[in-house]
Swiss-Prot record:
Residues forming coiled coils: none
Family: Belongs to the TPT transporter family. TPT (TC 2.A.7.9) subfamily.
PANTHER family cross-referenced by the UniProt entry: SOLUTE CARRIER FAMILY 35 (PTHR11132)
Region annotated Disordered, chain positions: 19-51
Pfam families: TPT (PF03151)
Segments of skewed composition (Polar residues): 22-32
Gene source species: Arabidopsis thaliana (Mouse-ear cress)
Protein name per Swiss-Prot or TrEMBL: Probable sugar phosphate/phosphate translocator At3g10290
Length: 355
């Protein structure tokens, strides 16, 4: 066979072998692409799961916030009214002691939030003033629980926006739109109706409850005035860190003077009821966790969401307290509380729109 004929035979063989290699290249490239795809899919799945994790985290925070807030309220009522532990000032001092210790551990050791330092004597005096007002509001609220059912206590407490608007106008001359003030009318009207329909109404308890509500509103307005400058502003956890020890020091002499037999009665109750000290400890820890979770919920949600959650929390506390303590309620009382809550919702909405 000639060399020319051999060349003709070799050409198709070479072309055939070249054609066979092409599919191999395409298969290997497809394999590489397939190897990359699982990573891309995992990235997409992780990015899609992160919003779910965030939602789960916020939902858990809200549930814990509700549990701690409502839990400390119901435990306060149980201890002060049903358990024979009639020492609201000492109970408040226990709460403040727990807040002082746990705030220090959370901020200094666990570093849950950055530590902010008091920079001047003037700033310290401002924080001390806020601490005294805060003490008065908590003590007043605890005293009122001795005489009033939780449901009515919450109805009166819902009038906080009314007192906040009042003190803001008196102390800072800050005016809201007239429609905003108009929304406060049902807030007050509802409490008046609820008071008339409350079977367990007690004048001293009512005065202490309304005073505690006013003090709470006064403290929020005063805080905005005293710690208004950027250099003196503290977040709520650092403010609690500095306010709590001052509150304990202020409450100690008041407890000794107004509740002199607190230690003997507490020791007696501790011998009679084996869970007495555990209840006091859990109650005090819950008081701190309510503040911590309130800070975290505020940080991770919007102001509007927080307002809605706060209103719903009051309603949930009322329902649970009625089921637990079985205090009698009337249609008039429920109607009055409902009007108050609707007024608070309307006030928040008008304030947001006419800001």
């Amino acid at each position: 066979m000639s060399s020319h004929a051999r060349g003709k035979e070799l050409i198709p063989l070479l072309s055939f072998s070249h054609q066979k290699k092409q599919p191999n290249l395409s298969i290997s490239s497809t394999t590489k692409m397939n190897k990359k795809n699982p990573d891309q899919k995992s990235d997409m799945s992780s990015s899609s799961s992160s919003p779910k994790k965030q939602t789960l985290f916020i939902s858990s925070l809200i549930i814990l916030w509700y549990t701690s807030n409502i839990g400390v309220l119901l435990l306060n009522k149980f201890l002060l009214s049903n358990y024979g532990f009639k020492f609201p000032i000492f109970l408040t001092m226990c709460h403040m002691s727990a807040c002082a210790i746990l705030s220090y551990v959370s901020i200094v050791f666990l570093k849950l939030v950055p530590l902010q330092y008091l920079k001047s004597r003037s700033q310290f005096l401002k924080v001390a003033t806020l601490s005294i007002v805060f003490c008065a509001s908590v003590v007043g609220g605890n005293i009122s629980l001795r005489y009033l059912p939780v449901s009515f206590n919450q109805a009166v407490g819902a009038t906080t926006p009314f007192f906040t608007a009042l003190f803001a106008y008196i102390m800072t001359f800050k005016r809201e739109a007239w429609v905003t003030y108009g929304a406060l009318v049902p807030v007050v009207t509802g409490v008046v109706i609820a008071s008339g329909g409350e079977p367990g109404f007690h004048w001293f308890g009512f005065i202490m409850c309304i005073s505690a509500t006013a003090a709470r509103a006064f403290k929020s307005v005063l805080q905005g005035i005293l710690l208004s400058s950027e250099g003196e502003r503290l977040n709520s956890m650092n403010l609690m860190l500095y306010m709590s020890p001052i509150a304990v020091i202020a409450l100690l002499p008041v407890t000794i003077f107004m509740e002199p037999d607190v230690m003997s009665v507490t020791l007696t109750l501790g011998r009679q009821h084996k869970y007495m000290y555990i209840l006091l400890l859990v109650n005090s820890v819950m008081a701190y966790s309510a503040n911590l979770l309130n800070f975290l919920v505020t940080k991770h949600t919007s102001a509007l969401t927080l307002q809605v959650l706060g209103n719903a929390k009051g309603a949930v506390a009322v329902v649970i307290s009625i089921l637990l303590f079985r205090n009698p309620v009337t249609v008039m009382g429920i109607g009055g509380y409902s009007i108050t809550v609707l007024g608070v919702v309307a006030y928040g909405e008008t304030k947001r729109r006419f800001r």
